[in-house]
Amino acid sequence: SEIFLTGTLRYLNTNLKAQIHQIIDDTIKSVEGITDAQITWSIPHTSPGLVNDATCTKLIIDAAQSLLGPENVQIMKESSMGGEDFAYYLEEIPGAYFRIGCSDGKTRDIHTNDFNLDERCMATAIKVFAETVRRYFRIHHD
């Protein structure tokens, strides 16, 4: 008989990718060694971990705090395991990924059919982006 397992493998630190793959490979060989199982595994594609540039992150935090007040800017204490295409950009150029809260007071999960973005948050996002760009050019344009 055959069993197929599928899943997602994500890394907070892309530098650990080879080490994690080796641990998986060693574990599979151990299982094969104590059973009659023949195991084939592959990871055809993995997305990079999203790692913000510290300088860009500070620029965004400073801009957001000046516009919204420090009490309205939350810094995530732990990394997120969510996959994000923005990580590919950060492999090429410095940048920072950040979230703009858009709660309307009703709890609905994103990526569901009843999620409804409160578009009023777009104005806040645009202001933070614009202030970040203004600060960037004030520092780097002189």
Explain the meaning of each model-derived region.
Residues 1-142:
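Metal-dependent amide/peptide-bond hydrolase catalytic core
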